[in-house]
């Protein structure tokens, strides 16, 4: 297989939940588990801990709210706590997005690269809501199997769409029942860094083409802080034995499209906020001495105002 630029990824690579990109879903879910166990959590994901702990002992330790795996490392504990705060804030942002979308009458949801996202189980969806989850087959199978074994029941009609987003996912989505005549609430959370820039542009092209009037989109756009991310994941590797190298899994082309600008020039009315602003608004401001250790992102919400023209 040929190598893809600015990453150690390879064309057509796949992964199980504890491997490669799949393992990052465990790391994110572990942060949601930590937040859920807090005294005054911003979000509640009662499924996060079991999804993470079922992957093995080291992962279970990562999901423990006391962060005991970082004992003796005060800086590491503070940095990881801020990272968990950010995951809580971004989850809250997108939970609110879905709430506003269904309040506006949207009843069709597509979660791109769903990973261990449990919104189809934990949010209170209106009757008739359909949630499509797109991801690698092994990731979707892992999540569904664990949740089923613990008696979890979806709160919407859930459809797993097992397909790689670098492949013909629109065909798979339509085959699963997606209705292109109905407005859709799309979500791309924690996804873009794991796609080459041209693949990200194609993804947005396809989302726009599939969107009926009234559709909405939410996106997490990254400006990767290489130093902070690398050091945090290195701590997980050194202390827990988790073999994850996020730097090697992500793409860093300097000429990638700006997600907000792309959407705005393709018929979407976009509102954005930086993660730092949103964290401060929700009482989770980043300590000044840790700013350089923290990921930089922009959280976007968009509404389709110019319907896509048929091909």
Curated annotation (Swiss-Prot):
Keywords: Methyltransferase, S-adenosyl-L-methionine, Transferase. Pfam families: LCM (PF04072). One of its GO terms (biological process) is methylation. The keyword Methyltransferase applies. It is an enzyme of class 2 (transferase). S-adenosyl-L-methionine binds at residues 135, 164-165. GO terms for molecular function: methyltransferase activity. InterPro entries: Ppm1/Ppm2/Tcmp, SAM-dependent_MTases_sf, SAM_mthyl_Trfase_ML2640-like. Transmembrane segments: none annotated. Disulfide bonds: none annotated. It comes from the Bacteria. Its EC number is 2.1.1.-. Belongs to the UPF0677 family. Exhibits S-adenosyl-L-methionine-dependent methyltransferase activity. This is Putative S-adenosyl-L-methionine-dependent methyltransferase MRA_0152. The lineage of its organism: Bacteria, Bacillati, Actinomycetota, Actinomycetes, Mycobacteriales.
